[in-house]
């Protein structure tokens, strides 16, 4: 079965959003620091690699770096420039929803990486002892969700549905 270019783009974007929002933002920080629960009680046992305490923050940072590579179309660990999601935005030729949005996303990627760098290992202890600081990092990651999932998808004309809409 052959997919059209638009179908391939939609698959990439949908997968990208699921990985970033569900696995990275929520799974690696939102659940452990408790922001995803009604009581906002930290759940340090949910950090990634709980038995390798010195790696949890590194895994979060590397995950954001991987999403950054996908956004920019970086190949071979950032040494080769291929077509990325940023290129689709720039191709719109619109100052506000193309280049301007790309600039906002680029700035937020830097802010999110800087925020992650402020976390300390072991992350399981950090989310308990400095929960408010971990919430601030989460807020930086959440800002990317809005830029990617709402603004970028809207600019590119992609409809994200959470259930089938085929009419049956």
Question: What do these predicted ranges mean?
Answer:
Residues 1-12:
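Single conserved hydrophobic/aromatic residue that forms the stacking wall/gate
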Residues 15-19, 24:
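Intrinsically disordered, low-complexity polar regions and short flexible loop motifs
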Residues 24-168:
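A cross-kingdom marker for long, charged
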